[in-house]
Structures are given as structure tokens and as C-alpha cells.
């Protein structure tokens, strides 16, 4: 019986992979990933067993990984962040449902951007928080507005993914809704290109959100009413 590992690789930095992930990637027969992840790992692992394709060819990548596992191979398919958070884990599990007696599947967690970004900012998620995607592909506009209204009133800390995908239109909507219920001085943090050479960290306020500074690699953290900035560079939500 073949085995399929569905692995989250965080931001693609080798040094932030879990030891479990490194051991699996050294042992499997094949590794499927997108071209960006391929570029990150082809020097750390045997590139002859890595099969990379275009980022937007997710469906084909999943199908090929499943087919290889059905042929009896031990296979890994990689996704950024954690594959169970806006990732490929659900795609794989839905597609192999009828083959569960022929493939052994393991979901291997990765460090999602909410966690790695929070660590760079300080400790913005000490209390309850929500994670919301602003992706045009995943976010139904009407449902998104309803979610944002509820979250704005709740005073939860919020992490926004895909804030510029493909435009900042949904980000503008989100900010305007939050400003209806929260102080314009609410602390926000933006992390871009986490643990990469062009990494950028920004601290600001909800009213002064720098739209011109965000891109497809940015994650937005919105604090609650207790969130503050220490020493002009650390974002903290007090525990007590």
C-alpha cells in the first residue's frame, strides 16, 4: 500500500520545517509541489524526486500525487503554511475518499502565517482570535461582509490572509467595516515575505493602514481594544 503525506511547509524556509517533515521528505519516493516551493527545497532534498509545476495547477498536482500513491509509492505533496488552513488537505481527502483502503494518508502540520507572523510582531494573538481570508476565489462577498460585521463587534483579534488577491478591494471593505465599530487607533501589524530576504514588518493603526505597502505575500493582524505597541516595535495583546 502506498502512502501519501500532505505536508505544510510554512513559508518555504527550510529552517522552519518541523523535524517530522524533514525526515519524511528524505524518505519518500516522490515529492509534489509548486514551482516556488521547488525553488526553495531543490538544494536541501534530492531534486530528482521533486516534481514541481505551476502554482495555479493545484488540481493536477493533487491528482498526480494520488495516482503515484495508488501505484504503491510513498509520496509527499507540499503546500505553503499549514495545508489544513486554506490549503490542499481538504482537496486530497475528498478525492481519495473512495481509495481509503488502498492509500494510507497522513496530514503533517506546518507553521501557518498567522503563527509565524505573530512571532515576528511580538505577541498579538495572546487572546481569542479569528482568521479570515480576503481571497476573491474563497470569499463570497456577501458572506464576507456578514463575517466582518460580526467580528468587528466581537472585538476579537483578527488575522487576514490573501489581503491583496488579486486586488485590495476586499481589504478596503474590511477596513471600512472595522472602523464602524472599532477605534481608528486600533493597532494593526503587517508582515510581508516572512523569513525571506525582502521581509518587511509594519506597525500602524486601523485608520492609517498603508494600502500601498501590502502585496500578495502580506498578512494583516488587527488587534483588539487592549492591543498596544511597546518600544515602538512590538505588538502585544495582554493576556490579563
Report the location of each language-model feature.
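Class I S-adenosyl-L-methionine
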Residues: 1-14, 19-105
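Short gly/pro/ser/thr-enriched loop/turn and capping motifs at secondary-structure boundaries
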Residues: 38-40, 58-59, 112-115, 137-139, ...
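A polyampholytic, Gly/Pro-enriched intrinsically disordered region
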Residues: 73-79, 124-134, 154, 206-216
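Fold-independent oxyanion-binding glycine-rich loops
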Residues: 9-11, 33-36, 53-55, 80-82, ...
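Short gly/ser/thr-rich secondary-structure transition/capping motifs
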Residues: 9-16, 138-141, 202-204
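Class I SAM-dependent methyltransferase SAM-binding "motif I" and its flanking Rossmann-like core
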Residues: 19, 85, 89-157
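A contiguous loop/helix-start segment that scaffolds small-molecule binding in enzyme catalytic cores
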Residues: 4, 153-240
Amino acid at each position: 500500500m502506498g502512502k501519501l503525506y500532505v505536508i505544510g511547509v510554512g513559508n518555504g524556509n527550510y529552517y522552519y520545517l518541523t523535524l517530522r517533515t524533514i525526515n519524511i521528505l528524505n524518505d519518500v519516493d516522490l515529492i509534489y509541489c509548486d514551482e516556488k516551493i521547488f525553488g526553495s527545497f531543490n538544494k536541501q532534498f534530492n531534486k530528482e524526486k521533486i516534481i514541481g509545476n505551476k502554482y495555479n495547477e493545484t488540481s493536477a498536482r493533487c491528482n498526480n500525487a494520488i495516482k503515484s500513491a495508488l501505484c504503491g509509492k510513498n509520496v509527499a505533496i507540499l503546500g505553503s503554511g499549514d495545508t489544513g488552513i486554506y490549503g490542499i488537505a481538504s482537496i486530497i481527502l475528498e478525492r481519495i475518499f473512495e481509495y481509503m483502503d488502498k492509500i494510507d494518508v497522513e496530514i503533517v502540520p506546518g507553521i501557518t502565517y498567522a503563527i509565524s507572523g505573530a512571532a515576528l510582531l511580538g505577541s498579538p494573538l495572546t487572546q481569542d482570535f479569528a482568521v479570515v481570508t480576503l481571497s476573491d476565489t474563497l470569499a463570497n462577498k456577501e458572506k464576507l461582509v456578514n463575517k466582518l460585521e460580526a467580528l468587528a463587534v466581537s472585538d476579537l483579534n483578527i488575522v487576514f490572509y490573501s489581503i491583496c488577491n488579486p486586488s485590495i478591494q476586499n481589504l478596503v471593505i474590511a477596513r471600512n467595516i472595522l472602523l464602524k465599530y472599532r477605534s481608528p487607533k486600533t493597532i494593526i501589524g503587517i508582515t510581508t515575505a516572512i523569513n525571506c530576504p525582502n521581509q518587511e514588518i509594519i506597525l500602524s493603526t486601523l485608520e492609517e493602514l498603508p494600502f500601498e505597502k501590502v502585496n500578495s505575500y502580506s498578512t494583516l493582524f488587527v488587534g483588539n481594544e487592549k492591543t498596544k505597541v511597546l518600544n515602538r516595535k512590538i505588538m502585544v495583546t495582554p493576556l490579563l
